[in-house]
Amino acid sequence: MTESFDNSPLVRTDFSNDSAWRAVVVAATAESAEGFRADLRVIDDRRFDGASPAALIVTSDGWQDAAVLFVADTEALVSPEHPILCVDLGDEPGRSFRCIASELWGVENNLRIANMDFDEFASSVDADEIFRGFR
C-alpha cells in the first residue's frame, strides 16, 4: 500500500547541482511577506532522476491524493527565479505551468485547500508561461 501525505510533493528530477537544488528548496519553502509558506513534502530521490511529469504521475508515490505535483527539473534549478513546474493531478492530469519559487506558497496553499482551481493560476501566467503572482 502506498502511503498518502497531506502536504504537496516537490520532486527533484535533476541531480546535476546540489547547491542549486538547495536554493530551490529554500526559496520554495520560505515564508512570504504575508506570513504564508508552501506546505511541501520535499522528495530528493535519485530514482526520479530525469523523470518526466507523465512518469511521475504514473508513479504516484504517495501523492495520489494531492491536487498538484511540483517538479524541480533542470529549468527550475538553472534559472535565477527557480520556475518550478506545477503539474495538475486533478481535473486535467498532466496539464502544467511554471511558478517562480517565491510565489509557490500561493499556488500550493490555494490548490491544497481547493480555494482556487488550477486553471486560475494556469491562465494567469506571463507571456513566457511562468506564474509570478497576481498583479
Question: Where do the model's predicted regions map?
Answer:
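Short linear, low-complexity motifs centered on an aromatic residue
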Residues: 124-135
